[in-house]
Amino acid sequence: METLRFSSNTMQVSFVCQRCNQPLKLDTSFNVLDRMTIHELTAPLVMVTANKQQDSGESSSFPEETFLENKQDGVARKFIPPARMMSAESTNSFTLIGEASDGGTMENLSRRLKVTSNLFDIMSGQTDIDHPLCEECTDTLLDHLDTQLNITENECQNYKSCLELLSQLPEEEEASLLNALQQLKQEEESLIQELESIETKREAVAKELDEGRNHSQLMDTEELRYQKEYCEFKRQQLELDDDLKSVDNQMRYCQIQLDKLKKTNVFNATFHIWHSGQFGTINNFRLGRLPSVPVEWNEINAAWGQTVLLLHALASKMGLCFQRYQLVPYGNHSYLESLSDKSKELPLYCSGGLRFFWDNKFDHAMVAFLDCVQQFKEEVEKDDTGFCLPYRMDVDKGKIEDTGGSGGSYSIKTQFNSEEQWTKALKFMLTNLKWGLAWVSSQFYNR
């Protein structure tokens, strides 16, 4: 609060404003303060009544809450005790020590500084404002206190008006006001009860609302789960629909193929009999031989193997068992077995050469095969009297007659026969087999 400055010959003590911190120059009257003045400064702001002074005069402390009302202005005064009481033995006192021109000057300066500090402590203890203050801050503080004083005086005046108005009210009006007050209290109690009832209902409604929200959240969770399940089932349904469409397409394709297969003649598809120039062919294998077209014997043997297989399949389809011979389809080494002599095999294949001209087993095998074709014809004629092959066969002579054409007969044997006639006889035999194949197909596949 104070600042001390020293020099070799002089010493100066200065104070600063407690608001703006500006240095202050104190009045000389602060240097002369007797004990009576200090006692007046430390006394309470408002003196209490004589009785209370006697009761509390010897006490070192003042009552914390004391109000007195001046009957002239009607203002209640509150005693504010000082924050720090000064005495000769104040603990805040101090002695300034330093160098001076003589001992008396230092003692006087210390005393003045102590008195001034005590005075500022007293002033700060009486109010909430710290001292010292500069002139400008003091003016600002006074303006603020004047404003508060005016507000307080206006409030006191309003209170006095209310008291005068209340004192002028007649007793009857007071009684009516008391009745009205009682009614208002009863109405207040009724409203409080109603408020409590409404609060209870509100709590119940809030509880129901919480339950409804919980139920709504549960329903939202269930809805989300059901939605996921629905999407999963929808995906499975789409996959199953795709699978079903795929299966339907496969069934439709299989049905088309089945219808096509039903219309397909197995024998015609398996055994294709046709001609190539002067040769009769079966599955594109030429059966026969010409001087100008020396067909390989492997091809001729393969053609005989297909022919044996065809007749064997037709007989099996009809349930026909040949007499005297048994067909053994064995590719390009097919042969016939004699039923009277099991050890006797008639080969329907040949390798050519000189042995071919002197070996008559090949010729016997071709005549035996012609016998089997004749038996097939006779079996068909038993079921269909109108059935007739285009070329008549003479098994005893081993010849085939061209009844519808030149009328000549052609031997199926190779010995003592030309290749042209042998090839033509084989061609006529394949033609008869083609007719037999057509009849079996019509009887068993086109019904």
UniProtKB/Swiss-Prot annotation:
Stated name of the protein: Beclin-1
Coarse class of the protein's main subcellular location: cytoplasm
Cell compartment(s), UniProt: Cytoplasm; Golgi apparatus, trans-Golgi network membrane; Endosome membrane; Endoplasmic reticulum membrane
The keyword Cell cycle is assigned to this record: yes
Induction annotation: Expressed during follicle development in the ovary.
Family that this chain belongs to: Belongs to the beclin family.
Motif (BH3): 105-124
GO biological process: autophagosome assembly; autophagy; cell division; cellular response to nitrogen starvation; cellular senescence; early endosome to late endosome transport; heart development; late endosome to vacuole transport
Entries under Gene3D superfamilies matching the protein: 6.10.250.3110, Autophagy protein 6/Beclin 1 (1.10.418.40)
Chain positions covered by the region annotation Evolutionary conserved domain (ECD): 242-447
Coiled coil regions in record: 140-214
Cross-link entry Glycyl lysine isopeptide (Lys-Gly) (interchain with G-Cter in ubiquitin), positions: K399
PTM remark: Polyubiquitinated at Lys-399 with 'Lys-48'-linkages. 'Lys-48'-linked polyubiquitination of Lys-399 leads to degradation. Deubiquitinated by ATXN3, leading to stabilization.
Membrane topology label: Peripheral membrane protein
Region (Required for membrane-association) location: 422-447
Oligomeric and partner information: Component of the PI3K (PI3KC3/PI3K-III/class III phosphatidylinositol 3-kinase) complex. Interacts with the poly-Gln domain of ATXN3; the interaction causes deubiquitination at Lys-399 and stabilizes BECN1.
The entry's keywords: Autophagy, Cell cycle, Cell division, Coiled coil, Cytoplasm, Cytoplasmic vesicle, Endoplasmic reticulum, Endosome, Golgi apparatus, Isopeptide bond, Membrane, Mitochondrion, Ubl conjugation
Domain observations: The coiled coil domain can form antiparallel homodimers and mediates dimerization with the coiled coil domains of ATG14 or UVRAG involved in the formation of PI3K complexes. The C-terminal evolutionary conserved domain (ECD) contains poly-Gln-binding domains such as the ATXN3 poly-Gln motif, consistent with structural docking models revealing two highly scored poly-Gln-binding pockets in the ECD. As some binding is observed with BECN1 lacking the ECD, other domains of BECN1 may also interact with ATXN3.
Gene Ontology CC annotation, any one: phosphatidylinositol 3-kinase complex, class III, type I
Residue ranges, annotated region (Interaction with BCL2 and BCL2L1 isoform Bcl-X(L)): 109-156
Function comment: Plays a central role in autophagy. Acts as a core subunit of different PI3K complex forms that mediate formation of phosphatidylinositol 3-phosphate and are believed to play a role in multiple membrane trafficking pathways: PI3KC3-C1 is involved in initiation of autophagosomes and PI3KC3-C2 in maturation of autophagosomes and endocytosis. Involved in regulation of degradative endocytic trafficking and required for the abscission step in cytokinesis, probably in the context of PI3KC3-C2. Essential for the formation of PI3KC3-C2 but not PI3KC3-C1 PI3K complex forms.
Disrupted-gene phenotype: Results in defects in morphogenesis, increased numbers of dead cells, abnormal heart structure, and reduced organismal survival. Reduces the regenerative response to muscle injury with accumulation of sarcomeric and nuclear debris.
Gene Ontology MF terms in the entry: phosphatidylinositol 3-kinase binding; protein-macromolecule adaptor activity
Note: Expanded poly-Gln tracts inhibit ATXN3-BECN1 interaction, decrease BECN1 levels and impair starvation-induced autophagy.
